[in-house]
Amino acid sequence: GEKNIPAGHDNEVVQRHFAKVLDEAKAMEKLGKVRAVNMPSGIKQTTKYPGCGPQFVWGAFEMDMTGQVIASSTYLTAINGNFVKLRVHYPKGDEQGHKTALLFVEKIRKVLGKCTD
């Protein structure tokens, strides 16, 4: 594994690892574990949360798992020399699932940042 991972989301080590994460999703399709991985161009984005807590590089894509299309997002940053990777999934079109996933990421970043607000 990686050693001496710099903190944050925008360094070369984290960016390189994020590219591997996306490649893993594509590989799952080739191995037949999922079908129809839909990864839009320009998938890589950066969070812009206000206040305390880390930011993440993230990307969202869709995949067919056993006949159900799943919306999937992966968030990545580094804290204390370690990668922190969050993956959230919910059925495509499930608005409550989408809202819950966004709230989860926002709350977990406050925990990771040891925020008091």
Model features per residue range: what roles?
Residues 52-53, 77-83:
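Short, solvent-exposed coil/turn segments at beta-strand boundaries
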Residues 86-117:
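Surface-exposed amphipathic alpha-helical segments
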Residues 1-20:
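A short acidic-to-branched-hydrophobic micro-motif
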Residues 27-74:
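Signature of long, low-cysteine stretches enriched in small and polar/charged residues
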